[in-house]
């Protein structure tokens, strides 16, 4: 019987889907739903959110380059949409940078984990 944690399995695709849904809720919540927090916490949330998207995307089998490109476009698009009347929040270059750092950290974490697992499998 195969492990439910194997790469490209149903569990990995489900985790990616949940991560995307959570990101939509976090990034596009109306201003009244965004809790007050100490300075910098929003950047940490962005970083962790995009790191999670990167790790879950790699686990689901999305290629590194494709995933990085899509996530950076998603980050930029989300910031642009936040500045519209549709969402009513402010666009932030700082949030975009935190998103990109999160993508890079997530991809790096996945590469380290996958490399270690390949080494122990031999």
Model-derived features: where do they sit?
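Bulky hydrophobic segments
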Residues: 1-96, 100, 104-122
